[in-house]
Regions:
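Short amphipathic alpha-helices and their capping/turn segments at secondary-structure boundaries
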Residues: 1-6, 48, 73-84, 124-129
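Substrate-binding cleft of secreted/luminal carbohydrate-active enzymes
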Residues: 3, 85-99, 109-197
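Active-site-proximal loop/short-helix segments
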Residues: 5-33
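Aromatic-lined carbohydrate-recognition surfaces of secreted/lumenal glycan-active proteins
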Residues: 7, 14, 35-75, 116, ...
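Short acidic, glycine/proline-rich loop/turn micro-motifs
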Residues: 19-21, 100-104
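Short, hinge-like loop/turn segments at secondary-structure boundaries
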Residues: 24-26, 76-78, 106-108, 192-194
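The substrate-binding groove and active-site-proximal loops of carbohydrate-active enzymes
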Residues: 29-39, 105-112, 147-149
Length: 197
């Protein structure tokens, strides 16, 4: 019994610190003077090497934004992470995207298939191809209501997210995110979770 995987959640530097860094009120450089993305990659390389000696898989959770072509302000850069861990898990929750992001004119959370498919096809798949040995992509999906009382996330929205990812070529699995971890709510999605995509 037990688990054969260690998942590093929020493997990043603090966000919203740009002004402090710019004004030299905070310095995140380590003793090796590595940039943030380098420091994260070095840590994950070390952790992966050590945990592999014990027969343990290593996964890392990253923001959906990290699949873009730039290094994020908090140091996450998809190619640097996918190159050193066994599993990478982006968090592209549809309610985290702005209304005009990716050219959509209606709120992204109302179009879970389109947003997940676009993100997967146009960003993740391209970043995965930039390295020789990319990790398996197992994406976090949104299992909570984006705006309580306004829009409900049920089986249809869960299915659309999973299908959008699969149609983009991301077939390494998914994990539903619901901060309350309410098992009764998860049961409502069992049809979506058990469907073949």
């Amino acid at each position: 019994m037990g688990f054969n995987e260690i998942q590093f959640d929020y493997v990043r530097f603090p966000d919203r610190t740009y002004t402090l860094e710019y004004n030299k009120k905070i310095d995140f450089k380590n003793t090796y003077s590595e940039e943030k993305a380098q420091a994260i990659q070095t840590f994950l390389m070390y952790a992966t090497d050590e945990l592999h000696k014990l027969g343990v898989y290593v996964s890392a959770d990253v923001f959906g934004e990290s699949a873009h072509t730039y290094v994020t302000a908090y140091g996450q850069y998809w190619p640097a992470i996918t190159n050193v861990v066994d599993v990478i898990s982006g968090m592209p929750y549809p309610d985290h995207f702005s209304n005009n992001e990716y050219g959509f004119t209606t709120p992204p959370y109302k179009q879970p298939y389109k947003i997940m498919n676009y993100w997967g096809e146009n960003y993740v798949m391209k970043r995965q191809q930039e390295v020789d040995t990319p990790a398996v992509v197992r994406t976090w999906i949104q299992a909570y209501n984006p705006i309580p009382g306004d829009f409900y996330y049920g089986n249809k929205q869960i299915e659309e997210q999973i299908k959008g990812l699969n149609d983009a070529g991301l077939t390494g699995g998914f994990m539903p995110w619901l901060s309350s971890s309410n098992l009764d709510r998860y049961k409502l999605f069992k049809d979506a979770f058990s469907k073949e995509y």
